[in-house]
Design a protein with these regions (language model features):
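P-loop/Walker-type NTP enzyme "switch/lid" segment
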Residues: 1-20, 100-106, 110
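Helical mechanochemical/support elements of P-loop NTPase systems and associated helical scaffolds
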Residues: 3-7, 30, 46-50, 78, ...
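Short amphipathic alpha-helical segments and helix-helix/interface helices
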Residues: 7-12, 31, 55, 79-82
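Inter-motif core of Ras-like GTPase G domains
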Residues: 16-18, 25-45
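Structural beta-sheet core signal
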Residues: 23, 39, 67-69
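Conserved C-terminal guanine-recognition region of P-loop GTPase G domains, centered on the G4
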Residues: 30-31, 50-68
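Short, acidic/turn-prone active-site loops that include or flank metal/cofactor-
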Residues: 41-47, 95-98
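C-terminal lobe/tail of nucleotide-utilizing enzymes
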Residues: 60-130
Length: 130
């Protein structure tokens, strides 16, 4: 389990350098130092409902958030339906990218990201002003 205090120290050290710091963490361990939170939501009712609750908590804490919709082959919700559930705009959609999960597990992200992933990442970076 990821320790929130340790993560806060790591993020603090990373922010001392130049550039952008990206942290992949659970909702419970989002560091206070994060200026933006990207919530990846599967196109499913349960995931959208959880994201809606998280967005309410983060909004109450005055955290800036964006939503990225993760499509799956068996997903049942459209972007418009997810937007209604989470009461937030879907900034980008990420389709199922065949073979990407396995490639990342074996050797990390490829040098050249697949076009849909590049597009979603670019949208997030533009939104956060990077």
């Amino acid at each position: 389990r990821l320790d929130k205090d340790l993560l806060a120290r790591v993020v603090g050290a990373a922010q001392a350098g130049e550039g952008i710091c990206v942290v992949d963490c659970t909702p419970e361990t989002i560091p206070d130092a994060c200026t933006h939170v990207v919530i990846v939501v599967a196109a499913e009712v349960r995931s959208a409902a959880s994201a809606a609750q998280l967005l309410v908590r983060l909004d109450a804490a005055r955290r800036r958030c964006v939503v990225v919709l993760r499509q799956r082959q068996w997903a049942s919700l459209s972007a418009a339906e997810v937007e209604r559930i989470v009461r937030s705009t879907v900034l980008a959609e990420l389709p199922t990218l065949r073979g990407l999960t396995r490639a990342v597990e074996i050797g990390g992200l490829p040098q050249r990201l697949p076009a849909p992933l590049r597009k979603a990442a670019r949208a997030v970076l533009e939104e956060v002003g990077a």
